[in-house]
Swiss-Prot record:
This is Tryptophan synthase alpha chain. Keywords: Amino-acid biosynthesis, Aromatic amino acid biosynthesis, Lyase, Tryptophan biosynthesis. Tetramer of two alpha and two beta chains. HAMAP family: Trp_synth_alpha (MF_00131). It is an enzyme of class 4 (lyase).
Length: 265
């Protein structure tokens, strides 16, 4: 059983919801990335999504775009991201880490070489935002062969056929995008999310995490009422953007602890 599957199995047995925060690797301070990952766990995260900086992050709103730009300006590439995971794994053997990003950096490294390097570093899952449906099956097969869960997005616009296809190739969890548009976009519609998740579950037996538009404890708790996990990205990246170097780790721990408390209430 993969670390991700094990984590969700334990959460289910405890009657708890998963908390999946996202940070951009190398932002805002490259030397703090591993400390921030540990801060997420201390606050109560169950899975960490670590963003791989990319120059054209088309699914991301301005907050995460700026984070990518700052990290790239500091020369944070895919190999450095894998180094962060390796350093995190030196002291945390249990918290799953999912790399989230775009196809280009992976294809530049080579998919087979990436799968091997990511597995050796201790990566548990990979979510590539821009793989078209016709390419995702081969990619998923390569990842699974390396012991990495291929994670895919579904959106309000996803067809039943797309859901069925993703159900065939995905493992770990399914990331449901609660809004049309980019990360950090406007208010989400809880009723539409609540209606959509049972449709996804008709096709896939995997846990469903919901992200995009979750900015505070109240929204997280509401989403936790209908989904298996809550994914929070833009709000965290914004907090880190605004925090000083000295405050960043504590600020992140406190924010995650508030969300965790709301989910467990």
């Amino acid at each position: 059983m993969s670390r991700i599957a094990q984590t969700f199995s334990q959460l289910s047995a405890q009657g708890r919801k998963g908390l999946i925060p996202f940070i951009t690797a190398g932002d805002p301070y490259p030397e703090l990335t591993v400390d921030l990952m540990h801060a997420l766990v201390k606050g109560g995260a169950n899975v960490i999504e670590l963003g791989v900086p990319f120059s054209d992050p088309m699914a991301d709103g301005p907050v995460i775009q700026r984070a990518s730009e700052r990290a790239l300006a500091k020369k944070i590439g895919l190999r450095t991201v894998l180094d962060y995971v390796r350093a995190f794994r030196a002291t945390d053997k249990t918290t799953p880490v999912v790399l989230m990003g775009y196809a280009n950096p992976i294809e530049r490294m080579g998919i087979d070489a990436f799968a091997k390097a990511a597995s050796e570093a201790g990566v548990d899952g990979v979510l590539v935002v821009d793989y078209p449906p016709e390419e995702c099956e081969a990619f998923a097969k390569t990842m699974r062969a390396a012991g990495i869960d291929p994670i895919f997005l579904l959106a309000p616009t996803s067809t039943e056929a797309r859901m069925a296809q993703i159900a065939r190739v995905a493992s770990g969890y399914i990331y449901y995008v609660s809004l049309k548009g980019v990360t950090g976009a406007a208010t989400l519609d809880l009723d539409s999310v609540a209606a959509r998740i049972p449709q996804i579950r008709q096709h896939a037996r995997l846990p469903v995490g919901v992200g995009f538009g979750i900015r505070d404890a109240a929204t997280a708790r509401a989403i936790g009422g209908v989904a298996d996990a809550v994914v929070i990205g833009s709000r965290i990246v914004q907090l880190l953007e605004e925090a000083s170097r000295e405050q960043a780790v504590q600020c992140l721990t406190d924010f995650i602890a508030d969300i965790r408390q709301a989910l467990d209430a």
